[in-house]
Each structure stands twice: as structure tokens, then as C-alpha cells.
């Protein structure tokens, strides 16, 4: 599991991105890069690192499911991911 401080930072960053999304869009359309530069760094969605929804793990993240490979495997074995079956050949 990731450190609680990292998970809290991730949620704070998500909130900042949501808060400044409309303003960023307007400033980009105008081409006002000076005002864009004055916005908080963490309001830029490019700086966001995808994290597992369950335990906050940043590595081996599967975008389609929103979880890491470890939690994906557990959820798939429990049958909690619709449409996922174990391969056998």
C-alpha cells in the first residue's frame, strides 16, 4: 500500500485539476500563457500520476480497470470484474 501522504496528495491534486479546468481551457484558447504560468503547478493534468483506486499503488497501473496488476488479479479471481475470465489453452 502507498503512503497515506501520497494518496492524500493525489486526491488534493485531483481537486486542483477539477477546480482550474475551465480557467485553463479559456486561457489556452486565448493564448494567455503568462496567466497560465501563474496557476498552481498541480492544476496541470499532465503532472498527475495514475494510482490504484484501492491501495494507491502507482506502478503497474491498468488504465482500463483503474487498478494495479496485483489488485486486478485478486478482483479477477473473485469474479468482481465483469467480462474477465482466466485464460486456458
Swiss-Prot record:
Q: What does the entry list under GO cellular component?
A: cytoplasm; small ribosomal subunit
Q: Name one Pfam family in it.
A: Ribosomal_S14
InterPro entries in the record: Ribosomal_uS14, Ribosomal_uS14_bac/plastid, Ribosomal_uS14_sf
Q: Name one GO biological process term.
A: translation
A GO molecular function term, named singly, is: rRNA binding
SUPFAM superfamilies on file: Glucocorticoid receptor-like (DNA-binding domain)
Q: Which UniProt keywords apply?
A: Ribonucleoprotein, Ribosomal protein, RNA-binding, rRNA-binding
Question: Of which family is this protein a member?
Answer: Belongs to the universal ribosomal protein uS14 family.
| Alphabetized PANTHER family for the sequence | 30S RIBOSOMAL PROTEIN S14 (PTHR19836), SMALL RIBOSOMAL SUBUNIT PROTEIN US14M (PTHR19836:SF19)
Q: What does this protein do?
A: Binds 16S rRNA, required for the assembly of 30S particles and may also be responsible for determining the conformation of the 16S rRNA at the A site.
Cite the record's note on assembly: Part of the 30S ribosomal subunit. Contacts proteins S3 and S10.
Tell me what this protein is called.
Answer: Small ribosomal subunit protein uS14A
Which lineage is the organism of this entry classified under, starting from the top rank? Bacteria, Bacillati, Bacillota, Bacilli, Lactobacillales
Amino acid at each position: 500500500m502507498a503512503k497515506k501522504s501520497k494518496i492524500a496528495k493525489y486526491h488534493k491534486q485531483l481537486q486542483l485539476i477539477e477546480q482550474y479546468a475551465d480557467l485553463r481551457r479559456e486561457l489556452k484558447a486565448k493564448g494567455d500563457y503568462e496567466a497560465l504560468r501563474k496557476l498552481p503547478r498541480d492544476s496541470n493534468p499532465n503532472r498527475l500520476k495514475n494510482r490504484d483506486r484501492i491501495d494507491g499503488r502507482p506502478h503497474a497501473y491498468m488504465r482500463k480497470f483503474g487498478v494495479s496488476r496485483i489488485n486486478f488479479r485478486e478482483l479477477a479471481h473473485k469474479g468482481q470484474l465483469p467480462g474477465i475470465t482466466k485464460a486456458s489453452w
